[in-house]
Amino acid sequence: MTEPQFRSKGPELLVELSQHVADTVKTVTELDPQTAELVGNARFAKHMMTVWGGQNVYFPMGISWRASQRDLQIYEEFDGRNHSALAKKYNVSLQWIYKIVRTMRKEELLAKQHTQA
């Protein structure tokens, strides 16, 4: 199926997903737009049809993933004295900053202990 045919006859989810893939490929690589479209439409869409065809697919909102990314960013910015500034910047409570720092320190310590064992 050519690209225009795929856009007009492809299932809506696959068409939209393949366009997002093409846009992402264009953004993160130096591929020309036509090649990026080929990757998204021809390769990715066909692969998804083969792998997940006929299945109901659920895409989580990624709330816990985004929160863990935010927590890591907070911990990296933490300097021992900027609890309040971080709470304001990330729109969380001061207690939440303390909890994040405590949790991240514990995880860091466990990781060090496992590498030394």
Curated annotation (Swiss-Prot):
Q: Please name the GO terms that the record assigns under molecular function.
A: DNA binding
Known DNA-binding region: 82-102
Question: Among its keywords, does the record have Coiled coil?
Answer: no
Q: Does the keyword Nuclease apply?
A: no
Question: What is the superkingdom listed in this entry's lineage?
Answer: Bacteria
Concerning InterPro entries, the annotation shows: c-mor_Regulatory_Protein, Homeodomain-like_sf, Mor_transcription_activator
Q: Which keywords annotate this record? A: DNA-binding
Its biological purpose? Regulates pectin lyase production in response to DNA damage.
What family is reported? Belongs to the c/mor transcriptional regulatory family.
This one is known as DNA-binding protein RdgB
> What is the species listed in this Swiss-Prot or TrEMBL entry?
Pectobacterium carotovorum subsp. carotovorum (Erwinia carotovora subsp. carotovora)
- Gene name of the record: rdgB
